[in-house]
UniProtKB/Swiss-Prot annotation:
Entry coiled-coil feature ranges: none
Cofactor(s) needed: Mn(2+)
Record: active site: 269, 345
Protein name (database record): Probable cytosol aminopeptidase
Localization: Cytoplasm
Pfam families in the record: Peptidase_M17 (PF00883), Peptidase_M17_N (PF02789)
Amino acid sequence: MQFSTFQKNLDNWQGASLIFGVLEEEIASQLEKIKFVIDPKLLLKKVSQKNFKGEKGKTLSFEFLDQKLETLIIVGLGKSKDLNKSDIENSIGNLVRKTIDKNEKISILLPWEFINSQLEINQLAESARLSAYKDNRFNKKKDEKKVLKEIEFLNLKKFENISFKETAQICEGVELARRLVAAPPNSLTPQEMSIQASQIAKDHGLEVKILEAKDCEDLGMGAYLAVAKGSDLNPKFIHLTLKSDGPIKEKIALVGKGLTFDSGGYNLKVGASQIEMMKYDMGGSAAVLGAAKALGAIKPKGLEIHFIVASCENMINGSAVHPGDVVKASNGKTIEINNTDAEGRLTLADALTYASNLKPDSIIDLATLTGAIVVALGNDVAGFWSNNDDLANDLKAASAQAGEELWQMPLQKSYKEGLKSHIADMKNTGPRAGGSITAALFLEEFFDPEIKWAHVDIAGTCWTDKNKGINPSGATGFGVKTLVQWIKNK
């Protein structure tokens, strides 16, 4: 899909489908803006008959109004004093999704005077493209409806020289993350994830290292391998490196949880635990690899970025880890496994230690780690923890710019008491109360405390069961845009 602009006299514009945004204010003068496709007086009469006043989220659709236009969709944006970027993005996203089956090209005209920057235009373009996303890989009968190929913005005089190149690159990263998360577990295996990572490296000139089980054993990754040994599929520890040309001013590690399927192990997932959905337990690694794809194309200056994924399955066989086993992580700390379904933090323990040994300035890990965060924050907001106020503030700012909502949670040190073990350095789970906090406290034990760190729990945000805003039902690709924006802000 491509983005384009039409900056010439609108009387010369030609198109089939137009989305037109209006404010909840005097309608007649706003309709004058589209006199190039229809008589404003005729349109005002039709709009008035529908009692449409531009209320936020309300839409009107007109077919074949004029020979110059097949479809006109008018979307209400609400009062100008209440107008915000998120509302515009969600409104346009919902409309694009409704029209993609009918059009190869959609044109958009909005009250651009209320858009404050090129970044906001780019993010609006992101929203339109990501709303139009479809995944038909596993359908026997391919979709024979039209495929949206172009989104055109009309009359962007305020932003004449705008470029959508980075916008497309970021969207490609999000779309990759969505495809990875949505892929069934017999399709996206640890082996396939390593192939996808290697392809990113090949396409964008990244260094790639894939560690096999023996390599991980040599590094002492007893926590990660304890999870992996219950599966007949070999684990793959993935490490991509993106190095900027010229002097490196900062080194960063992005770590993603990579469970391509999580049965729960001997603490088997049952009942409402949604075992059938546990293909998305690699949502963190999908975000990291999606960011690698986008950043590999963007090539930010002055940075060395490491993308790390400890990929495996959590399954049950004769070799699977038992509840009560004690394992040793690669930093030498011992862990009593009191719950085999708290496996993600075990894989992350060794992944974070590996990242820490690279001596980065910052580490950010993303993981579908706990159900507790879903109870706390629902499905629209991801929780995050950080040991550094500057990093936390930068991450919050990036998430706000990217339109992915984060909420900072406390690293409540008193809760570490719940992780104490009588026979090992710690247990892998604490009490039920505060479960997402104790999970973060567990992770904090596996990297140099001098390194700035943030942990993002995306268990509630990596998937949606229904169309919502810019996300069609299914995988959301949550986290890619925030990571990329955080890097771009450097």
